[in-house]
Design a protein with these regions (language model features):
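Short N-terminal strand-loop motif that marks the start
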Residues: 1-74, 84, 154-158, 162-168, ...
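C-terminal hydrophobic helical "lid"/dimerization subdomain
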Residues: 2-7, 268, 291-295, 339-389
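Glycine-rich beta-strand-centered segment in the early N-terminal region that forms part
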Residues: 28-42, 55-128, 169-173
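NAD(P)H dinucleotide-binding glycine-rich loop of Rossmann-like/cofactor-binding domains
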Residues: 96-206
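Mid-domain Rossmann-like dinucleotide-binding core that forms the NAD(H)/NADP(H) cofactor-binding site
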Residues: 154, 169-253, 257
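C-terminal substrate-binding/catalytic core of Rossmann-like NAD(P)-dependent dehydrogenases/reductases
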Residues: 257-268, 274, 311-362, 370-371
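Glycine-centered, small-residue-biased loops immediately flanking beta-strands
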Residues: 301-302, 325
Length: 389
């Protein structure tokens, strides 16, 4: 018989590549400025998948999961405007602003603030190995699901909780499962901004996982034409249902040739041709897609790299120089998001202007965390897998 200890909770603890174990761990205690959230749903992110497959981004003993939604069950004495029973999305673990004086704050990057209350210590073995997100000494204020326990558990705490700062209420019309898309949707919003889209642009999105499908929907109101590509017919069909204008099955035809056919042959300084897409947002993390993205884009166009690559890529960098491409990337969209942007993203979900429910392909209970991750690895069968503690 399974005996549950007092003040404990069930959690999926990460022990390394392809090794989660559902265990009873100590339930966190909140401080006067914190709130406790009972996790109702947590989405599997692409970075979680890399941790599962390769053992990176986390370390043994942590509880992963950062795309979560739940119900407030405990509120610290100094917290205002958040009540027990509120349905919420907790966002991230970095404070709203840095010290304002350090190297990073002076460069408008407070997410890397050197103040000890905001940034890793720089001294522990993890920091010395440049794995600052795993800092052993400053877990309280680090990102949930990376360096402090996250959403693959029954409960999680939110430090220094503030409404529309790191806690956002869920409208009645939005389910917990749909609300887990708030963080990735904001990421999609920022990645589209990086591309500086114009109303007359043609944009290409390569890779139609959750992020690619969200990027596609955010782009819809900002450009004149969207072309998408993937190797999964399931995901391509979903893109069609979400009103993608042009869909390319990269397993059956050459995406570069098709984009060139649709956009025209644009020559660069080197004299070589290629596509004339104004924007390419590469979300797949496939080496072939990276190379195609460079060739699909017109001279002077924008390439945004979103997908994570498992291996080094051999590539002629002169192609980027000759085409005068604006190449940008981001592992994390940046500093604490302005509250207005997050509220806007929640409104996009609530209004169904960005459709997230069709992206949920599977749901699993916490006890089945391993089958959940195995399912998420199968791109031909899944889109977004939700874990429900």
């Amino acid at each position: 018989m399974h005996i549950v200890k007092a003040n404990s909770m069930k959690a999926a603890v990460f022990y390394g590549a392809k090794d989660f174990r559902v265990e009873d761990i100590e339930k966190p205690e909140i401080q006067p400025t914190d709130v406790m959230v009972k996790v109702k749903a947590c989405g599997i992110c692409g970075s979680d998948l890399h941790a599962y497959k390769e053992g990176i981004f986390s370390r043994p003993g942590f509880v992963m999961g950062h795309e979560m939604a739940g119900e407030v069950v405990e509120v610290g004495s100094r917290v205002k405007h958040i009540l027990v029973g509120d349905r919420v999305v907790p966002l991230g673990g970095v404070k709203e602003k840095g010290c304002g004086e350090c190297f990073w704050c002076q460069r408008a990057q407070p997410q890397w603030c050197s103040s000890v209350s905001h940034k890793p210590c720089g001294e522990c073995p993890q920091c010395q190995s440049d794995k600052f997100w795993l800092c052993e000494k400053n877990q309280r204020y680090m990102t949930a699901g990376y360096s402090r326990n996250g959403g693959y558990a029954e409960y999680m705490f939110v430090p220094d909780a503030g409404l529309n700062k790191n806690v956002y209420k869920i409208p009645d019309s939005v389910s917990f499962e749909e609300a887990t898309f708030l963080e990735p949707l904001w990421g999609a919003y920022k990645w589209v901004e990086m591309a500086e889209p114009q109303s007359h642009d043609t944009a290409v999105v390569t890779g139609l996982g959750t992020i690619g499908l969200l990027v596609m929907q955010v782009l819809r109101e900002r450009v004149s034409r969207i072309i998408v590509s993937d190797v999964s017919e399931k995901r391509l069909q979903l893109a069609r249902e979400l009103r993608a204008e042009v869909v390319i099955n990269a397993a059956e035809e050459d995406p570069l040739a098709k984009v060139t056919e649709l956009t025209g042959n644009g020559r660069s300084f080197s004299g070589r041709g290629g596509g004339c897409a104004d924007i390419v947002i590469e979300c797949s993390g496939a080496p072939a897609a990276f190379k195609q993205a460079i060739e699909m884009t017109r001279t002077g166009g924008h390439v945004v790299l979103v997908g994570l690559y498992e291996h080094e890529i051999s590539f002629d960098v002169n192609r980027i120089i000759h085409k005068q491409l604006k190449l940008v990337s981001s592992f994390n969209p940046g500093r604490r998001p302005p509250a207005a942007e997050i509220v806007d993203c929640m409104d996009l979900i609530a209004s169904d202007k960005v459709k997230v429910k069709p992206l949920i392909s599977h749901e699993f209970p916490l006890d089945e965390i391993m089958p959940a991750f195995e399912t998420q690895t199968k791109a031909g069968e899944s889109v977004k897998v939700i874990v429900k503690p």
